[in-house]
Amino acid sequence: MSKTTIVLNQLQHLLPLREFEAFVGQHQADKYVKRLTCRNQLTILLYAQATGKDSLRDIQTSLTIRDSSWYHLGLETAARSTLAKANEKRPCQIYESLFYKMLEKCGTFSSGTASAFSFQNDLRAIDSTTIDLCLNLFPWARFRTQKGAIKLHTSFNVRSQIPDFIEITDGKVGDITAAKEFDLSQYPKGTIFVIDRGYTDYAFLKAIVAAGHHFVIRLRKNAQVLRLKAHRPPCGKGVLKDEKIGFVLPQALKDYPEDLRLVTYHDDEHDVTYEFITDEFRLSASNIALIYKQRWQIELFFKWIKQHLKIKTFLGTSKNSVLTQIWIAMIYFLLLAWTKFQTQFVGSLLELTRMIEEVLLEPISIIDLLNLTPRTVKRALARAGPPQLALL
């Protein structure tokens, strides 16, 4: 048998575990704990994310069947009630803090998306996604009269393709309300925020500019603006107009008294004309249109995590249990992104996810694994050692 530790253990050692233990100590979350520590809880819930486990029973079954693998992780079988209690009682803030500490580690890399830009500014997309919940099971998540929901308000780094801020609220919290709570000082000066027009709040846009950043957002259909003069002659495919404008209504003028730039752009592929407003006057109109197109990246991120992480079905019904599961899902996403970047894995993030799922409890080096293809993984498993179970 190879002396290489199992893949799950290798992934965990990519995490800032010393800081994690400090977070646990701050909350005294392991006080009086005899068996299932916070580290054990993290291990189990990462495993559940990687393998798509839907229930505590599924997890317990795996702990029982693969007991030798779990033993090498320092974990004995855990009763469902023990894990359920841990998810309900251990503060979810521990895992939220771990997410942001891991995010610091991921802050230096970028994806191939950056090559599409001819400018150096950091680019962030701001949006939210709603996760529906059954109100009878999750009464704390009241959204409408007969519907429950929570929202993930997110700032997404388009260059690195990872979220750099997430706020989880109940479904009633409006997008702009949550956005106004973002700490704009944490972003590098000159960051460009691309925002859906549902976030149109001129005081919020002014706050972005006051913090030393820029924004690109679609003009609302009912917005009343005064077209002052042409900013530049239309230049670039699809660019119809490039103008300087100002607001007309008193409240809009009060919230944003400065002039803005209006770029009118026609998308030939979908035969749709868009109007973008921005405070950025230096970039070309084509770049302004390209920036807004990148807003779609956050929609793809939301779609990906809903399809491939366990954030729509939950192992518990308490608020703390749900938030714990979501934060650990986000930690697992960062682990995948970090692994893909560091190993320069040429496949997609989904391919990486599927390969790791197949070998999560096997003693295979991650570096060796990512040099394989899905077809050759089985051969690698055969070389790694004998099967854990035999049918007699």
Residue ranges and their predicted role:
Residues 72-92:
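Major-groove recognition helix of helix-turn-helix-like DNA-binding domains
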Residues 141:
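A glycine- and small-aliphatic-rich helix-loop capping segment at beta-alpha/alpha-beta transitions
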Residues 1-58, 62, 90, 97-101, ...:
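Single, function-defining residue in the core of a domain
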Residues 66, 70-72:
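Blade-loop segments of beta-propeller domains
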